[in-house]
């Protein structure tokens, strides 16, 4: 595994983690907002 492929995989992993984190946070906010109403 070359350094370039490691950087590429790391970048993809970071983006995926950020997207999952945003989706999870949005889902929790939506659930909490629904219960509050």
Curated annotation (Swiss-Prot):
Topologically, how does it sit relative to the membrane?
Answer: Single-pass membrane protein
Q: Known InterPro entries for this protein? A: PetM_cyt_b6/f_cplx_su7 (IPR012595)
Select a single GO molecular function from the record's annotations and give it. Answer: electron transfer activity
Subcellular location(s): the record lists: Cellular thylakoid membrane
Top-rank taxon of the source lineage equals Bacteria
Q: How does it assemble?
A: The 4 large subunits of the cytochrome b6-f complex are cytochrome b6, subunit IV (17 kDa polypeptide, PetD), cytochrome f and the Rieske protein, while the 4 small subunits are PetG, PetL, PetM and PetN. The complex functions as a dimer.
Q: Please give the function described in this protein's UniProt entry.
A: Component of the cytochrome b6-f complex, which mediates electron transfer between photosystem II (PSII) and photosystem I (PSI), cyclic electron flow around PSI, and state transitions.
Instruction: Indicate the family of this protein.
Output: Belongs to the PetM family.
Can you say what this protein is called? Answer: Cytochrome b6-f complex subunit 7
Name the source organism. Gloeothece citriformis (strain PCC 7424) (Cyanothece sp. (strain PCC 7424))
Kindly list the organism's lineage. Answer: Bacteria, Bacillati, Cyanobacteriota, Cyanophyceae, Oscillatoriophycideae
User: Gene that codes for this?
Assistant: petM
């Amino acid at each position: 595994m070359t350094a370039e492929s490691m950087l590429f995989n790391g970048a993809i992993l970071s983006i995926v983690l950020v997207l999952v984190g945003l989706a999870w946070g949005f889902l929790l906010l939506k659930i909490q907002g629904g219960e509050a109403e």
